[in-house]
Amino acid sequence: MKDLPIIALDFESKEKVNQFLDLFDESLFVKVGMELFYQEGPQLINEIKERGHDVFLDLKLHDIPNTVGKAMEGLAKLNVDLVNVHAAGGVKMMSEAIKGLRKHNQHTKIIAVTQLTSTTEDMLRHEQNIQTSIEEAVLNYAKLANAAGLDGVVCSPLESRMLTEKLGTSFLKVTPGIRPKGASQDDQHRITTPEEARQLGSTHIVVGRPITQSDNPVESYHKIKESWLV
């Protein structure tokens, strides 16, 4: 799995994806989320892979264990590089996800979403009714993911150092909420720069709008890549 910034392809159509990818003459690591996958389906994944790019399929599966396991059997056939579930589904659900994935696929990494980077302390307490800090909530979900045998989690860069200390350096910390200096925060709350994410222990970063909505996506990508890989 490439150690590159993961570009979130937050587009609504295959045509816009191809227009964006045509700008680059190099292999990328891209994220396909719900918006795009539900519009275009598995065929788009195959086409992106055929172009030589790594793919993070970000569907955040969360259902009863049997359903998630069966769904993961289907996703396994797409041979993406990274998939995820939601840790709130519990250890049994995450374990079934791994079983389903490994029936057809031995190389895809699987991680769990902990708390979205748009989540605030107020939302955690009053909407989710979780009466702890965000850091404690993330750590609890990360421990469950680790116990289930997952490869890592999705978290904010602000929790990466804590998770490295508690769960080790090999436990993946895939972190959205990345904004270059001076970029708009948008709907993210727990954010850092690429350099800060690296220093805090993130193993991978996910960046969307600062690249995809840039006037010069290639230049913006390379600036972020350079600051991440420094």
Curated annotation (Swiss-Prot):
Q: Which residues form the active site?
A: 60 (proton donor)
Q: Name the GO terms of the biological process aspect.
A: 'de novo' pyrimidine nucleobase biosynthetic process; 'de novo' UMP biosynthetic process
Q: In which pathway does it act?
A: Pyrimidine metabolism; UMP biosynthesis via de novo pathway; UMP from orotate: step 2/2
> EC number(s) of the enzyme?
4.1.1.23
UniProt GO molecular function: orotidine-5'-phosphate decarboxylase activity
Q: Does the keyword Lyase apply?
A: yes
Q: Which UniProt keywords apply?
A: Decarboxylase, Lyase, Pyrimidine biosynthesis
Where is the signal peptide, in residue numbers?
Answer: none
Q: Does the keyword Lyase apply?
A: yes
Q: Which residues bind substrate?
A: 10, 31, 58-67, 117, 179, 188, 208-209
Among the Pfam families in the record, one is OMPdecase
The cross-references to PROSITE patterns, in alphabetical order and at most eight, read: OMPDECASE (PS00156)
Q: Which reaction does it catalyse?
A: orotidine 5'-phosphate + H(+) = UMP + CO2
Report the sequence similarity comment from the record: Belongs to the OMP decarboxylase family. Type 1 subfamily.
Protein name, as recorded:
Orotidine 5'-phosphate decarboxylase
Organism from which the protein derives: Staphylococcus aureus (strain Mu3 / ATCC 700698)
State the taxonomy lineage: Bacteria, Bacillati, Bacillota, Bacilli, Bacillales
Identify the gene encoding this protein: pyrF
